[in-house]
């Protein structure tokens, strides 16, 4: 699969909700990972229910697998990152978990292009994203305690960014600032579904994003002439 422009070309099963749905060809249900069928490109490894007393075994059976392009996980730790870092063609990773208090550094995943984070309700920082130099698409949904997303500013090659921390209950807690966005000069797609503390609706950080083609943002940021300013300063923008 071509993972480029994953959000803008609506390649996810339930656009724009990249954390929902089943990817075409997705394989799951193999607790013994040595039994994953040959030819598997998309592997789903959800966390089993406690009452089933099931767990995954033989993680090392995945090591150096050159066919797997995408993995969905319900839990991630350093051991799993070590195995995933050996997959030469891993382009997509989804982490959906509400039981982890922290996530280890993802830097070893050097080939990663698309990262989807959802329902990670206990984590309050995203330092683990730093140095993902090849990342093109970052999707963050329902990181309820996210306040400072400045580590995103280091993802200089990022082309697509989806930020939402409210879920079904609204827009969630405000973030510290929009300023980190100003350094994402390659950004072409932006969904900014969060508010900024102190009701700060200054959109000047967005005016640096000259490559931006798609923008979805809360209406409150478009008042008092801001919408007109965006149209004037961002010529490629297609509302």
Language model segments and positions:
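Concave beta-strand-loop units of leucine-rich repeat
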Residues: 2-104, 108-239
